[in-house]
Amino acid sequence: MAKKSNRYSYAPELVALGKAIRLVRLEIGLSQEALALSAEIDRSYVGGIERGEHNLALVNILKLARCLGLSGAQLMHRAGL
């Protein structure tokens, strides 16, 4: 199986952000699908974000943060960034 060539895949910062998104999502009782619908992004993309596989655009970070009840800064803080 071929490896992903995306140079951002699994960067520590993306993994930390993904873990923070997953943790907050679970804390507030949202499924990936519910978060995706609320943020108007695909559910499979949310899964990839939570695994640190996607280099998110700022607009998507802010949309996800808002849907999780956080500001972008609060989400970054939760991720240790």
Which residues fall in each region the model found?
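Short basic helix-loop element that most often maps to the first helix and adjoining turn
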Residues: K19-S38, K63, L68
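Recognition helix of helix-turn-helix/homeodomain-like DNA-binding domains
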Residues: E40-H54
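Hydrophobic micro-packing sites on short alpha-helices
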Residues: N60-A65, L75-M76
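Short C-terminal boundary/hinge segments that cap the last helix of small helical domains
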Residues: G69-L81
